């Protein structure tokens, strides 16, 4: 039986839930599908269906990023449910890098917590400028003053990371919205209020449709008898069946052919910038592909391992390290969906200033040498991490080798 064709009838937006572990991100995602399924605007997805991987169920936390589809009266959404546990921040980076906007879920019982802050920081670093807050579990709060304090604390946190002062904060209870036994469910209205805020507050992103095709690979699957499927968000350009694309990364460059294109298990005639797609490829084995590699229009991207960058090192107050950084320092660099070790040297400009070390809060020009050659270009942004935390952010200003 032929698969349903994905028809683009509304503007497409990538949205996602971020926030601390156990604050209700996955429950909220399930509640959104529950409410919209009544109007045939989503397929109902339970908490267990969203948290479907064995290791997720075993630990009771989200490890991978789950993609859910739904629509409102005016938009089509791809919703990414992001991990909240500190051990899996790198997967959160993969998911968040695909978002046009985010829903920050904060428990009214706990208030903002460590991962709340880190997720906001990461969102800012990877270019998410529009956030909506869902203050969850308010059914467990009897004192309005406590609720006001949590909202104030959340506003202060948004201000600290330079998010707008008019950021909507919706109060509600995702779990209560899922309760079938309530005769009058005011909590469902709160989900609609959240969706209305999404439609009105998150602007339609400008897609780079005219630039050469580029997709950063997030995941890889093998379909017996058919070939290898890669998934990810199209960063720019477009792609269709029969196109030849180049796979690049980890010292590998190879041309492959697109023989299948899907979005949410539906056949896609053409994939465009902003779409989260699955691409069936001919001419490559699953073992040859790694997360972090990219697909691009042939001859538009090349492999490099040494670049110059403008870098900002976070202060302790921003969640950064306390100690200074010296030449030879080897942290992890996160570019698109790849995380890779690299060593730093001071650029000639930095050396001319007499700099011997970099202190938290400094902005410097650095030369970075990665352990593998990867696809990169001027203007690419990256995060720098060590020991489970983000310690810096930068932008590539020149390719050296």
Swiss-Prot record:
Keywords: Apicoplast, Elongation factor, GTP-binding, Hydrolase, Magnesium, Metal-binding, Nucleotide-binding, Plastid, Protein biosynthesis. Residues 173-175 are annotated as: G5. The keyword Aminoacyl-tRNA synthetase does not apply. PROSITE patterns: G_TR_2. It is found in: Plastid, Apicoplast. Residues 19-26 are annotated as: G1. The keyword Plastid applies. Residues 60-64 are annotated as: G2. Residues 81-84 are annotated as: G3. Residues 10-206 form the tr-type G domain. GTP binds at residues 19-26, 81-85, 136-139. Its EC number is 3.6.5.3. Residues 136-139 are annotated as: G4. Its main location: plastid. GO terms for cellular component: apicoplast. Mg(2+) binds at residue 26. It catalyses: GTP + H2O = GDP + phosphate + H(+). GTP hydrolase that promotes the GTP-dependent binding of aminoacyl-tRNA to the A-site of ribosomes during protein biosynthesis. Monomer. HAMAP family: EF_Tu_B (MF_00118_B). Belongs to the TRAFAC class translation factor GTPase superfamily. Classic translation factor GTPase family. EF-Tu/EF-1A subfamily. This is Elongation factor Tu, apicoplast. It comes from Toxoplasma gondii.
